[in-house]
A protein has these predicted regions:
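Bacterial N-terminal signal peptides that target proteins for export
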Residues: 1-9
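Beta-turn initiation residues at beta-strand->coil junctions
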Residues: 46-50, 71-75, 92-95, 146, ...
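Short, solvent-exposed coil/turn segments at beta-strand boundaries
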Residues: 36-42, 59-69, 83-89, 137, ...
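Short loop/turn microsegments at loop-to-beta-strand junctions
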Residues: 79-80, 127-128, 174-175
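An acidic-aromatic
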Residues: 56-116
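Flexible, processing/modification-adjacent segments and terminal tails
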Residues: 24-29, 37, 91-155
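N-terminal leader/targeting segments and the immediate start of mature chains
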Residues: 2, 13-66, 213-218
Length: 218
């Protein structure tokens, strides 16, 4: 269970470097994330590479305090499922649900808060890349740079040259963020090296099924 929680934490912490930013682009991404938080429920499905090999994770959110996550690791095909409802958490052992320790529930609450919290102070800078066709769907694409990861502002004489060199680094990590222009909702997020966008380290897709329900196990 803790391994699954660690993987979820890694997803929440995934950040990237980006192209020069635009205030308007940042507002578009922030508006999309705010709209997602206000949705009745949404589902995130991810594929990523971990030390244990390929990982598939499905996480469902029902703001303000409900979450379900199902994690499958390649070396152990039996999925690990857990539920959080109003600060209490349960894990599924075979066909039986068991209440999890308060400290594990607390970790899940923290993860939920990270996803549903305000991103305005942490998202960093954003660059618009325009309309992009993704698997047959036209989406608005963005690259995001997390200022907290970059560190304090570089005021050295060669700061501009350092910035140009960083953007020229084809192995630098990038986060690509995609928004549906019709609904204004986030649709996917990709974390990859700049020269390997077709082989992402982490990829998440977002859907908004109206039938998501998360209840405490009986």
């Amino acid at each position: 269970m803790r391994q699954a929680l660690a993987l979820t934490t890694l997803l929440a912490a995934t950040v990237a470097l980006a192209l020069p930013a635009s205030a308007g682009c940042k507002e578009e991404v922030l508006d999309a994330l705010d709209k997602q938080r206000k949705a009745p429920a949404f589902r995130m499905e991810t594929n990523m590479v971990s030390e244990q090999g390929p990982v598939k994770m499905t996480v469902e959110y029902m703001p303000p305090d409900r979450m379900r996550q199902i994690v499958t690791i390649a070396i152990n095909p039996v999925p690990v499922e857990s539920i959080l409802v109003a600060g209490k958490a349960w894990g599924k052992d075979g066909d039986t649900w068991k209440e999890l320790a308060p400290e594990i529930a607390g970790e899940m609450v923290t993860q939920l808060d990270e996803v549903l919290g305000d991103d305005r102070g942490t998202i960093g800078t954003v660059a618009c890349l325009g309309s992009t066709a993704v698997e047959g769907q036209d989406l608005m694409a963005y690259r995001v740079e997390n200022d907290a990861q970059v560190g304090p502002e570089d005021r050295s004489p060669d700061a501009k040259e350092k910035a140009r060199a960083a953007l020229a680094d084809e192995t630098r990590p990038l986060r690509m963020f995609y928004i549906d222009p019709k609904t204004g909702l986030p649709m996917r997020s990709v974390f990859a090296r700049a020269n390997k966008l077709d082989k992402p380290i982490f990829k998440a897709t977002y859907t908004y099924p109206p039938d998501i329900k998360i209840e405490a196990p009986k």
